[in-house]
């Protein structure tokens, strides 16, 4: 397949801006799902929505669209429709050759850059055909611990492997390892008392939680492992009350299952140790959930080699990277379906300064087109 034409590049940019302007925080993807499904249907492709909404709480399910190819082989291409929550409308604007949000909100390039690219591939295929059958999987609630992809039934796929395009780093990078991720919720239940008259009668839940957090190893624990406390709530607002309740949310993640399990176990121990401290004795409830599992691709994994070949064909020097972030690829890999995550050139995802250059957006389109050729010829 030839590289994208100037007309295709212009259409890609226009479509990207239109998609970014459609609000789609996780759980509220109906509007963008309807837009994308409608466009694919008008192109003549079969589109189906699954029942993931029932389990994820989203407004709609995942979309699966099939684009027939000139061979009887198939490959899956994945992007997610949702974004992180945001306030206010998104107004995409071009600044110095790149797309940004005009306001103080996210742009939504995560992952609408990939959605736009896959839609551009579908537009090309509708006119010129495709060397291999393509299954587009457009998921919901990726930003909610990969909920949509985890609910997707990979048994519906004709493909034997696939690719996601959901890493905020320069085009050319290929993710070869991603972490296992645990989330911890700790609640401390003490007893209230007047802080100025009878503080001895109270048991401070905030003090207990603080001691637990202070004892934890947080930040980068080693080259492959991180831990963080992300939020804490407690007390009733008055400084004259010994607080009887406090809770916090934390996480640990690592490319090593052994390391992350050790880290999360130590965090749990610190919670109970703090609850047993005579200075702030509290009842402690700790809930730990494994939200997704990690993976590490083999050196000669076919998907990795195909991605690298496609990148070289487009003039990029491939670079294999390890990441501390998760993507739908984690969910597919956990379900036994090989999936390689390829960087999409976006920058500063989840921030008001989020950006993607036109060069990166258009480059990804060329890479995906080349990738279909590589997979078809493999």
Can you name each region flagged by the protein language model?
Residues 53, 81-83, 137-145, 167-169, ...:
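Acidic, glycine-rich active-site loops and adjacent beta-strand->loop/helix elements
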């Amino acid at each position: 397949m030839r590289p994208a034409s100037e007309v295709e590049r212009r259409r890609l940019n226009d479509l990207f801006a239109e998609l970014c302007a459609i609000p789609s925080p996780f759980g509220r993807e109906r509007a963008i799902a309807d837009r994308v499904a409608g466009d694919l249907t008008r192109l003549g492709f079969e589109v189906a929505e699954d029942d993931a909404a029932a389990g994820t709480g989203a407004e709609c399910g995942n979309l699966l669209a099939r684009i027939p190819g000139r061979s009887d082989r198939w490959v899956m291409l994945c992007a997610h429709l949702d974004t992180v929550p945001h306030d206010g409308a998104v107004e995409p604007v071009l600044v110095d050759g790149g797309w940004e949000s005009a306001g103080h909100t996210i742009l939504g390039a995560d992952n609408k850059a990939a959605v736009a690219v896959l839609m551009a591939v579908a537009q090309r295929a509708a006119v010129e055909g495709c060397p291999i059958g393509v299954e587009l999987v457009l998921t919901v609630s990726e930003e909610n611990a990969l909920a949509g992809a985890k609910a997707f039934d990979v048994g519906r796929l004709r493909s034997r492997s696939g690719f996601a395009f959901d890493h905020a780093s320069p085009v050319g990078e290929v993710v070869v390892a991603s972490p296992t991720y645990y989330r911890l919720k700790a609640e401390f239940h003490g007893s209230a008392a007047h802080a100025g008259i009878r503080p001895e009668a109270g048991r401070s839940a905030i003090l207990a939680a603080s001691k637990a957090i202070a004892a934890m190893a947080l930040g980068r624990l080693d080259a492959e492992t991180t831990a963080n406390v992300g939020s804490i709530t407690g007390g009733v607002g008055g400084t004259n009350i010994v607080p009887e309740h406090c809770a916090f949310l934390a996480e640990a993640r690592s490319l090593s299952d052994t390391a992350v399990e050790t880290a999360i176990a130590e965090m749990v121990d610190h919670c109970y140790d703090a609850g047993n401290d005579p200075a702030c004795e509290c009842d402690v409830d700790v809930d730990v959930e494994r939200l997704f599992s990690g993976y590490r691709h083999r050196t000669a994994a076919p998907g990795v080699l195909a991605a690298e070949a496609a990148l070289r064909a487009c003039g990029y020097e491939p670079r294999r990277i390890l990441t501390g972030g998760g993507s739908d690829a984690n969910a597919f890999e956990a379900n036994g379906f090989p999936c390689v995550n390829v960087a999409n050139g976006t920058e500063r995802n989840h921030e008001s300064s989020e950006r993607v250059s036109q060069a990166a957006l258009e480059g990804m389109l060329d890479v995906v087109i080349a990738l279909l050729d590589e997979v078809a010829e493999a």
